Every structure is written in C-alpha cells, then in structure tokens.
Amino acid sequence: MAWEHLRVTDTPTWPSILGRLTTGQNLGTGQAAWAMDQIMTGTATPAQIAGFAVAMKLKRPTSAEVTELADVMLKHARRIPTDVIGNETVDIVGTGGDGANTVNLSTMAAIVVAAAGVPVMKHGNRAASSLSGGADTLEALGVRIDLGPEQVAASVAEVGIGFAFANQFHPSYKHASAVRRELGVPTVFNLLGPLTNPARPRAGLIGCAWAELAEVMAGVFASRNSSVLVVHGDDGLDELTTTTTSTIWRVQAGTVERLTFDPAAFGFQRAHLSELVGGDAEYNAAEVRAVLGGAKGAVRDAVVLNAAGALVAHAGLSSDAKWVPAWEAGLARATETIDSGAAEKLLARWVRFTQKL
C-alpha cells in the first residue's frame, strides 16, 4: 500500500490528517490510504471515521486521494473471478444522494444493456436516502441479491448480467456504513460505491449527484484506463436526465473531456422531474415491469437514454469509437431491445437463474 512506504517521521495520525483536512489542505501521498485502512480494519473509532468522512467532503477530495480510498477498499473486498467473465464488462451505477427519489433508472438500463448483448457487472446497494435502492428493487422483482463471487460471475457468464450487492462484497466497510447512516448527509464515502465494483469492469455509465465531484471521479477512472461516462444531470440527478441537459465527463484512453449533452438533439421530449419519481421497492418493481413490457412515456425515455449511454461507454473500449454515431447506434439498440421483448425475457431468465443457485 502507498502508506506502507511513508518515512517513519511521516507516520500518519488522526490529529495530523484531520488537522490538514479541516484547514483545507490536501493530504500527502499515502495518508488517505492509511486512514481508509484504519477504517476498514476496525481500528478507527466512529468519531474518527465521521470526522474524516465529513472533513474530506468539505475540503473537496482530489482524484489522488479518492484513488487511494478506493484502492484500499478494493484490497479488502471479496473479488469476483474475472477469469470467467473478463473485465470488458460495464457497470451502470450512481452515487445516490441526489434527493430526487426517482425510479431505479440505472437498474432498468442495466437490464436493457445486458439484453442488447453487452455483459453487465452491476454494483449496488440498498437505499441510503431514497425509498428504494437498486438492491431493494431487484429483490422485489425476484432476483436473488445475496450471491457470492462465483455465483455472480456465473450469472454474468450465463445470463449476461450479475449484481454484486455491496454488503456481500465489502464486509470490512461495515465500520464506515454504520457511521454513514448515522450522519445522514453525503460524505466522501458516497463517491466510493461506483469506484469499488469488485469485478473492476473497464466500462461504465457512472452518475454523480455533485457536479463539483464528478470531475474527481472521472480522474480516478482515467488513472485506471477505463472507458467511462461520468454524468450529472443539470437538474441535479445522478443519471442522464431528460428534464434538461446533462454534463458528461467522457473518460477514454486516460483523458477526461467535459461535454454538455442535450437529449433533445436526439429527439427526446423534455420531461418533468415529477414523471420520474418512484416509490417503495414494490412500486419501483412495477415500473420496471411496465417499461420492459413496452409502456411508453418519460420513464422509458430516461431508461433508453441511460442504456444508450452505457452502450456508448462500452463502445469506447475500442479506440476508434465516434461520439455521435455511437449514440445513434446505442439509442437504436436500446429501443429495439425493449420493443422486441428481449429485455423482458432477460429479466425473467435472470430471476430463474439466481433462484436456482
């Protein structure tokens, strides 16, 4: 680990780290890794964890700091065997914390992308602030979410999609998650979920609820040589929105390019945020069934848009992918996948497969 190479005189302490953060100073190399290791091993106290989580968010973390946090978390995670599924899979996940209580757009988009033939390795959790997170909704649909590493890999290999339930794969994170729940406000830990997929997929459509931190996340993905679209709806959503424009940080070949994206340019009607609002797990599961069953409207539009975004990100693994043609192809594929019934069939197959395990 980075912190293991610190000189003896530089050995971090909580007062030195919290002192730097609370005076707005960036941490030195290895200090964020040391702090995260203390948290993941259960050495840090709840007060130290809370102080670190809030102070880091207020200071505004750098990509280097967040990379250290994510790398330590992955070091402690249960690994999904990528010799079975490779790493050219795609994740579709957001930070949460946008407060909008929308239906589970990324979950629906993930099913559509998998049905379009691109392997999906989704990482997710129960709701932190909304009524129903991706895990809650999948459970209501009948997908087993408590699978271990080999079972998740088998699901990707057999069905084309797998779900890594964060609690199952990051057992050492329990020390931080209890504090996070008690705090009830966004912290630096909100950024870590999308950055710590235990299968380390190389492609992703990653939503960030905070525009000022989206670029930080993009920097982490750039250092991993990923092909990722980090997206922030200009209405505050941690998804590609259909109510207005979105800002996209396009990560490809180690570079980050910031773009403004207007779905109207591809023929999408402006939606009202109220049309995208969800409810509890049963309500959101019913929305999934309706959209995959062909129901038209604002939710379907948002699902098609986000599924296309993930297809564009995956296409970006090939260096010759062109932006507008990739979007046109992605939107056509996402639409066809729903209209042909392929997405609906894939969900049914996924439920059957996981229930047999």
UniProtKB/Swiss-Prot annotation:
Transmembrane segments: none annotated. Its EC number is 2.4.2.18. Mg(2+) 2 binds at D238, E239. It comes from the Bacteria. InterPro entries: Anthranilate_Pribosyl_Tfrase (IPR005940), Glycosyl_Trfase_fam3 (IPR000312), Glycosyl_Trfase_fam3_N_dom (IPR017459), Glycosyl_Trfase_fam3_N_dom_sf (IPR036320), Nuc_phospho_transferase (IPR035902). The keyword Signal does not apply. It catalyses: N-(5-phospho-beta-D-ribosyl)anthranilate + diphosphate = 5-phospho-alpha-D-ribose 1-diphosphate + anthranilate. The keyword Metal-binding applies. It is an enzyme of class 2 (transferase). 5-phospho-alpha-D-ribose 1-diphosphate binds at residues 94, 97-98, 102, 104-107, 122-130, 134. One of its GO terms (molecular function) is anthranilate phosphoribosyltransferase activity. Anthranilate 1 binds at G94, N125. It holds the Pfam family Glycos_trans_3N. Gene3D superfamilies: Nucleoside phosphorylase/phosphoribosyltransferase catalytic domain, Transferase, Pyrimidine Nucleoside Phosphorylase, Chain C. One of its GO terms (biological process) is L-tryptophan biosynthetic process. Pathway: Amino-acid biosynthesis; L-tryptophan biosynthesis; L-tryptophan from chorismate: step 2/5. Belongs to the anthranilate phosphoribosyltransferase family. Homodimer. Catalyzes the transfer of the phosphoribosyl group of 5-phosphorylribose-1-pyrophosphate (PRPP) to anthranilate to yield N-(5'-phosphoribosyl)-anthranilate (PRA). This is Anthranilate phosphoribosyltransferase. It comes from Mycobacterium sp. (strain JLS). The gene is trpD.
